[in-house]
Curated annotation (Swiss-Prot):
SUPFAM superfamilies: HydA/Nqo6-like (SSF56770). InterPro entries: Cytochrome-c3_hydrogenase_C, NADH_UbQ_OxRdtase-like_20kDa, NiFe-Hase_small_C_sf, NiFe_Hase_small_N_sf, NiFe_hydrogenase_ssu. This is Periplasmic [NiFe] hydrogenase small subunit. [4Fe-4S] cluster 1 binds at residues 41, 44, 136, 172. It comes from the Bacteria. It comes from Megalodesulfovibrio gigas. GO terms for biological process: anaerobic respiration. Keywords: 3Fe-4S, 4Fe-4S, Iron, Iron-sulfur, Metal-binding, Oxidoreductase, Periplasm, Signal.
Length: 288
C-alpha cells in the first residue's frame, strides 16, 4: 500500500486514491507489457531495474506482467521471437525504449535480421496503448543529434502514419515512477491528459525551475559561479553554470529518483534531458 500511495501522489490524486491503484495492480489479470528495444543505451531499463519501492522483482512479477523484455529474458533466438509473437496475440501495453533508425531503409538497427522499424510497426498498432519511455524513444535522443547519420527519430514520428499515438515519458533516463504512474492511469482512468509534446501533464506540467529547492536563491540573485565554489557549497542557484531548469518540464524536484536525490540537489545543473532535441538545442551543457 505504501507503493500505491506513492504512485497516487505522483499522479496528483493524493493518498485517498491509493486503494484504486491497489485494485488496478492486484487484479486477477495483471497488465501485460511488451517492452521493445531500439537505438538506446538501456539506461531507461536500468532506471526501472533500480526502483526500490517496489523492487524490480515485485514490479515485474506482482504489479505488471512483463511478457517480453530482451534485457530481462533468459531465453534467446527463436524462443524469444516466439514469445513475442505469443505476447502480442492478447491485450497488452507496448513500451518502446530507444529511437527508431529510419535511414537507409532501417539498415542501422536490426534484431534477428529484422529492422527495428518493422518490428515496432508489427507490434505497436496491435497494443491497447503505446508508451515511449525515455528521450530516445520520445524524440530520438542522442542518436538523433546532428548529423544523425542513422536517421533516428522518435516513436510518434516513425509510427504516426500507422495510427500510433504514443504517450511520451521523456527523460534521460526517466523516473520509473512516471512510467508506473502512467500504466496505472491507463488502467484506472484511461488515457492521461497530454501536453503538446505528448507527455502526461500530471508528471510534466511544471518546469524544474518552478519547484527547484534553489529557486529562492535565483530570486535573490544568489548564483554559484563555479563548481566547488563557496556559493555552490551553500546551495546557491546553478543557472549561471548552465542550468536549463527554466526551460525543462519534468517533476524531478518533486519525485526525486527512488525518493532520494536528483541532479540539481546533488550539485549538477539540469541539462533539459526531457525536452525535444536537447542534445542539439541545449549544448553546451555547462556555462562555467
Amino acid at each position: 500500500m505504501k507503493f500505491c500511495t506513492a504512485v497516487a501522489v505522483a499522479m496528483g490524486m493524493g493518498p485517498a486514491f491509493a486503494p484504486k491503484v491497489a485494485e488496478a495492480l492486484t487484479a486477477k489479470k495483471r497488465p501485460s507489457v511488451v517492452y521493445l528495444h531500439n537505438a538506446e543505451c538501456t539506461g531507461c531499463s536500468e532506471s526501472l531495474l533500480r526502483t526500490v519501492d517496489p523492487y524490480v522483482d515485485e514490479l515485474i512479477l506482482d504489479v505488471i506482467s512483463m511478457d517480453y523484455h530482451e534485457t530481462l529474458m533468459a531465453g534467446a533466438g527463436h524462443a524469444v521471437e516466439e514469445a513475442l509473437h505469443e505476447a502480442i496475440k492478447g491485450d497488452f501495453v507496448c513500451v518502446i525504449e530507444g529511437g527508431i533508425p529510419m535511414g537507409d531503409g532501417g539498415y542501422w538497427g536490426k534484431v534477428g535480421r529484422r529492422n527495428m522499424y518493422d518490428i515496432c510497426a508489427e507490434v505497436a498498432p496491435k497494443a491497447k496503448a503505446v508508451i515511449a519511455i525515455g528521450t530516445c524513444a520520445t524524440y530520438g535522443g542522442v542518436q538523433a543529434a546532428k548529423p544523425n547519420p542513422t536517421g533516428t527519430v522518435g516513436v510518434n514520428e516513425a509510427l504516426g502514419k500507422l495510427g500510433v499515438k504514443a504517450i511520451n515519458i521523456a527523460g534521460c533516463p526517466p523516473n520509473p515512477m512516471n512510467f508506473v504512474g502512467t500504466v496505472v492511469h491507463l488502467l484506472t482512468k484511461g488515457m492521461p491528459e497530454l501536453d503538446k509534446q505528448g507527455r502526461p501533464v500530471m508528471f510534466f506540467g511544471e518546469t524544474v525551475h518552478d519547484n527547484c529547492p534553489r529557486l529562492k536563491h535565483f530570486e535573490a540573485g544568489e548564483f554559484a559561479t563555479s563548481f566547488g565554489s563557496p556559493e555552490a557549497k551553500k546551495g546557491y542557484c546553478l543557472y549561471e553554470l548552465g542550468c536549463k531548469g527554466p526551460d525543462t518540464y519534468n517533476n524531478c524536484p518533486k519525485q526525486l529518483f527512488n525518493q532520494v536525490n536528483w541532479p540539481v540537489q546533488a550539485g549538477h545543473p539540469c541539462i533539459a534531458c526531457s525536452e525535444p532535441n536537447f542534445w542539439d538545442l541545449y549544448s553546451p551543457f555547462y556555462s562555467a
